[in-house]
Amino acid sequence: MKKAIIFLLSFYSCVGFAEPQQARSDYSIEESQAKVNKILHTTSLYRNGLSYNERVAEISSRFLGTPYQAHTLIGSSSMQERLVTNPSTVDCFTFLDYVRSMAHASSWQTYVSELVKTRYTNGMIDFTGRKHFFTDWAVISPRNAQDVTQDISPYTITVNKQLNQKNKKQEYVKGLGIISRRISYIPASAIDKEVINKLQ
């Protein structure tokens, strides 16, 4: 189930890379291209016979052992956004960006195009248009995922959240504004084998 595997990816990417390691800061675009091409070449051998979910699983496995590094993207409210592709080190979000983009790509060129569509609103490389929150994937065009939380458990709870609000006057990430959004989640006490099986 395509929807569920995206949800599952978000969970495993955050716990699977939780231990920071020493990351390289000198990773070149040539090395990035070589790694992406190697992954695409390997998975393309099976592409015709693999479903989207199977491609995601195959590509994800190629990132096992990848060092964790936060803040690899370049851009802020005071600095021009640049497109970064650095699959040598990942955090929860860049891991998802890279895997989804590769799952839709057949070459370096199509991978870069997919990465722009995955990471940014309407494919425009801009800090304020970057999808900063995972729920952006299900809300902002182009949509990368669907929120299936309510489909997999009758015990889902939905709350109103003010994303990026630190307090009444401050933002966690300056320049993004406060984003009001309804967030659905499954309480830990309601996560049982039946729920987990629906994520497979």
Could you say what each language-model-derived stretch is?
Residues 63-200:
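Acidic/His-rich structured neighborhood in mature extracellular/periplasmic domains
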Residues 12, 51, 100-103:
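Functionally constrained cores in energy, signaling, and assembly domains
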Residues 4-12:
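Sec-dependent N-terminal signal peptides
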Residues 13-18:
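N-terminal signal peptide c-region/cleavage motif recognized by signal peptidases
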